[in-house]
Each structure stands twice: as structure tokens, then as C-alpha cells.
């Protein structure tokens, strides 16, 4: 990661539905795949950079197995909490953005921001559901929902170990 000092933290408001978005992660995977394709068949194929890019692609590919519908499918239409209600819950995530407008955020920061807003959204769902239930017994479908949230959370956390090759390394 680049030095923190060139980035600032910006509170960003999301609805849960907006935050449960893996587009940025898929874009990063595609960018790394492009690197791999461009280096294939060249002398760069045996470099550390090639291996790192390849490794990043294979880790980021796990994003395809993340399916937020698994969460929404757990919610019955007539249940305690509706999917629409949950999707509309607003919260704030602190995302990092370069201090200089000329600078694009690094891949590591783009990934980190995506992981942050998805993880925050999952936590926000948990809190919302627990508040809504209060002291009531947790119904089966809510237990399944919590377990679906936990599964997705672990999948997202695995993406936190992805390392991107530097332009010049």
C-alpha cells in the first residue's frame, strides 16, 4: 500500500443495497487478468510480477461466488423484516481517497474501500436485525440470514490478502 499520508478518509453514505456491490472488485480482477494476458508469451512470464498478477487474479476470482441474493432469499415476504426495508437502511463508511485530485486511488485502496463498504453493510444488517428483534427469540429464517451474512463476510475477508504487483516492481 502507498503511504497513508497521501490519502484522506472520507465519510461516505450508502444504503445497504448500494454498498453490497462487488463491481470494483470484479474490475480489479479484470485489470489484473489483462496484465497476465499482456505478459503471457513474453519474457515477463517468468517474473515475480507475472506471478503476483496471476495470484491476484485467482484470489479476486472468488468474488464471482459472492451472491448477495443468498441473503435476500432468506427473507420471507411476510417476515419480521422485509428485504426492501433492509436494503434501504442508510449508514456511513469511511473510505480512503487520494488527497490530490490528480491522483487515482491505488488498486490496494480501491480493493480496501470495496471490502470496507461491503463489510460495513453486512455489520449494519446484523445490527439492524438485532435491534428489530430486541429480546425476541430469533426465528429460523433470521438465523439462516445471519449465517448467510457470516458466509459472505468470510468470503470478503479472504480478499483482504490480495497483493497487487507494482507498476515498476
Regions found by a protein language model. Give the residues of each.
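Long, low-complexity or tandemly repetitive, helically biased scaffold regions used
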Residues: 2-24, 31-169
Amino acid at each position: 500500500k502507498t503511504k497513508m499520508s497521501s490519502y484522506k478518509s472520507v465519510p461516505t453514505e450508502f444504503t445497504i443495497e448500494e454498498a453490497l456491490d462487488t463491481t470494483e472488485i470484479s474490475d480489479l480482477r479484470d485489470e489484473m487478468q489483462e496484465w497476465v494476458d499482456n505478459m503471457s508469451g513474453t519474457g515477463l512470464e517468468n517474473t515475480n510480477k507475472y506471478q503476483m498478477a496471476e495470484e491476484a487474479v485467482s484470489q479476486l476470482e472468488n468474488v464471482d461466488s459472492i451472491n448477495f441474493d443468498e441473503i435476500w432469499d432468506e427473507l420471507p415476504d411476510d417476515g419480521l423484516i422485509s428485504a426492501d426495508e433492509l436494503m434501504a437502511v442508510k449508514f456511513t463508511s469511511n473510505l480512503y481517497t487520494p488527497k490530490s485530485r490528480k491522483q487515482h486511488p491505488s488498486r490496494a485502496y480501491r480493493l480496501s474501500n470495496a471490502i470496507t463498504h461491503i463489510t460495513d453493510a453486512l455489520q449494519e444488517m446484523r445490527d439492524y436485525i438485532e435491534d428489530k428483534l430486541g429480546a425476541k427469540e430469533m426465528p429460523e429464517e433470521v438465523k439462516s440470514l445471519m449465517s448467510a451474512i457470516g458466509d459472505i463476510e468470510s468470503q470478503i475477508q479472504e480478499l483482504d490478502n490480495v497483493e497487487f504487483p507494482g507498476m515498476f516492481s
